Amino acid sequence: MYAEYVNQLKNFRIRETQGYNSWCAGYTMSALLNATYNTNRYNAESVMRYLHPNLRGHDFQFTGLTSNEMLRFGRSQGRNTQYLNRMTSYNEVDQLTTNNQGIAVLGKRVESSDGIHAGHAMAVAGNAKVNNGQKVILIWNPWDNGLMTQDAHSNIIPVSNGDHYEWYASIYGY
């Protein structure tokens, strides 16, 4: 793939991937805050422990987060996180990335609304123009060791296990 333009969060790195748990939002926020603060002090487990200090064992392993908890955590870390009831546009991603503001993707699985991964959070690492001007958004799925490119005109995200997620909302400002 030929990239004629790439705009990525300068310090975005994949430091950990999601195992058998429901912590996708923790992984997403950790990656975004580590990037925008240029640190490595955040990790998914500590984020989840901060938000659910009294859960233990199976209950802790399989707790997820609400969008309000994600907003609250971002704000507790000095960020003015905001909820957007839709996918962010290519131009919004470009501007937020340029301004070193991370974006979380909130997705609903298209195939089934049941099970451990019915809802899923992913991180926007930036945006690019590839293959003669096709606009794409660079997304990190916490299950994966690399970034994927998402057509900027589609809110349906195919992921590595074969499922598809509808990008129904965003939280930006991490």
Swiss-Prot record:
Name a Pfam family for this protein. Answer: Peptidase_C47
Membrane found in the keyword field = no
Q: How does activity depend on pH?
A: Optimum pH is 7.0 for elastin hydrolysis.
Activity control, as annotated, is: Also inhibited by chloromethylketones TPCK and TLCK and by human plasma inhibitor alpha-2-macroglobulin. Stimulated by L-cysteine.
Q: Name one GO biological process term.
A: proteolysis
> What upregulates it?
Expression occurs in a growth-phase-dependent manner with optimal expression at post-exponential phase.
Q: What does this protein do?
A: Cysteine protease able to cleave elastin, insulin, myoglobin, fibronectin, fibrinogen, HMW-kininogen, alpha-1-protease inhibitor and alpha-1-antitrypsin. Along with other extracellular proteases may contribute to the colonization and infection of human tissues.
Its name, as the record gives it, is Extracellular cysteine protease
Record the organism.
Answer: Staphylococcus epidermidis
